[in-house]
Amino acid sequence: MASKEMFEDTVEERVINEEYKIWKKNTPFLYDLVMTHALQWPSLTVQWLPEVTKPEGKDYALHWLVLGTHTSDEQNHLVVARVHIPNDDAQFDASHCDSDKGEFGGFGSVTGKIECEIKINHEGEVNRARYMPQNPHIIATKTPSSDVLVFDYTKHPAKPDPSGECNPDLRLRGHQKEGYGLSWNSNLSGHLLSASDDHTVCLWDINAGPKEGKIVDAKAIFTGHSAVVEDVAWHLLHESLFGSVADDQKLMIWDTRSNTTSKPSHLVDAHTAEVNCLSFNPYSEFILATGSADKTVALWDLRNLKLKLHTFESHKDEIFQVHWSPHNETILASSGTDRRLNVWDLSKIGEEQSAEDAEDGPPELLFIHGGHTAKISDFSWNPNEPWVICSVSEDNIMQIWQMAENIYNDEESDVTTSELEGQGS
């Protein structure tokens, strides 16, 4: 039996490598930017910070990322990294690529540098890290324990204490187990939600300050789910509304003004398998999306949750991340176990397709990023550079990329499919 499994693994590995080679050959046609960077350890989390600096007379801008580590029994860190992203006028040429390193060059002086700027000791791997919108120096993290940690990275040395001691500014208590979901309220400073394997969602107000030492107890614990709560998200326009999704296949909408924490305002059987993630649309107060182990992304309208608006189908395995674009109301991306990051355009739902196009996926599937050869752990849309995404996968690879403008601008591409498929063969 073992040999059969080994054989299947080898075949899969071969297929993955083959697909990667084809992807790499086609990058000049498909992307305006691709930067591939091997991290020292895999990161389970990634988020762009909102800050951007444009150095005088340089052909790049500086951006920052929040990352974490997932080591093999070595010291873990919360990481802030600095990234050089070439300006539009710095000619990026994806065809200049060093095939051994998987590095893409061709920016003139910029080689798409990525440097670790701050490393802070962390207790165990960083399951997820998210900055507080009202003060991006403040970062909350999910740990392998039940504690949620809060760090103000300006109060920590750039190089971690060699003792390995983890010294968070606050320690948030209320969960019994670890988890992944984490969401800061963009309308109420300091209000943080966390989802856990203990079937609950905790809410803290970090402004309340610690009761003793650095410990802050949960302000409320929401107990509606009957299984692991995978993700939680505040509504972006209503300060008291949030959503949670869980392995009980349900999406729940909660209102913190309600006098009960055991029953949500709305409950919907969202998928036919575990629901792993959700995201509220930043432009439309009624629209949200959920992603599931049933390999689909579902679109919902808060005014009528009984009816699923749309199902996005193309992923071949579980979906773990879904995020709306910060710049375009109709653009959404999803990723997960199938090593693909799909970008969807709601405005194309129902468009007519040729039989040939239909084979590639539904009309609303705008783009498939195929650069990862392992499961994608997380991704983040750059808030300052439209269409730039950073994605991280389980094999230590981080990619910063932007699809070619002709793909999202609806202009007829001058690249024929035969050129793409047959290139170099």
UniProtKB/Swiss-Prot annotation:
WD repeats lie at residues 47-122, 128-173, 181-217, 228-269, 275-312, 318-369, 376-403. Disulfide bonds: none annotated. GO terms for cellular component: ATPase complex; chromosome, telomeric region; cytosol; ESC/E(Z) complex; histone deacetylase complex; nucleoplasm; nucleus; NuRD complex. Gene3D superfamilies: YVTN repeat-like/Quinoprotein amine dehydrogenase. The modification Phosphothreonine is found at T10. The keyword Nucleus applies. GO terms for biological process: brain development; cellular heat acclimation; chromatin remodeling; DNA replication; negative regulation of cell growth; negative regulation of cell migration; negative regulation of DNA-templated transcription; negative regulation of stem cell population maintenance. InterPro entries: G-protein_beta_WD-40_rep, Histone-bd_RBBP4-like_N, WD40/YVTN_repeat-like_dom_sf, WD40_repeat_CS, WD40_repeat_dom_sf, WD40_rpt, WD_repeat_RBAP46/RBAP48/MSI1. Pfam families: CAF1C_H4-bd (PF12265), WD40 (PF00400). Belongs to the WD repeat RBAP46/RBAP48/MSI1 family. This is Histone-binding protein RBBP7.
